[in-house]
Amino acid sequence: MSSFISAGTTRDTAESTIENNGFWPDIPPSDFRERHRLDSTITSARIEGALLAAMATVNRMLRHWQAEKVDAGYPTVDDIPVPVWQAPGVFLGLYLRAVFSTAHASLIERYADYDATNSARERGEQLADPADSYRRDAAWAISEIEGRPHSTVELI
């Protein structure tokens, strides 16, 4: 027995830009789809839900840094002066990396939900490592924004 599964390439509906808090930019789901090469096999609703949850997580983690910058007179991330050794737009780029990586990790963990067979369970186990890699990318991007090292080591 053989089967054919078509991978979609068109979007199922027009995706609305997800509004952010004013300090960080609004996020068009199409940017996430393009940067992470996600086609229409993942529905717009799933993409938007993952992005909204990721934005909430990353915004919460960066809330103190954001408050510090706003108090210093920078109402948006674009207003923050970039250190001379960094590329222009570095804070925005790192923020998008953190949000997109967090959202992608969430989506990867859900792929096994499509199929209750043994192959789905095996596929879910294989996808655990990429999800962890995306979470690590998000954590490192947040650390870079905050000016912290990527890891903390303690002597026991």
What is each PLM-predicted segment?
Residues 90-156:
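Short loop/turn elements at secondary-structure junctions
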Residues 78-94:
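Short, glycine/alanine-rich amphipathic alpha-helical segment
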Residues 75-82, 124-128:
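Amphipathic alpha-helical surface "interface" segments used
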Residues 19-20, 28, 87, 91, ...:
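A general marker of short, structured functional hotspots
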Residues 1-80, 143, 149-156:
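Conserved short "hinge" loops at termini or chain/domain junctions
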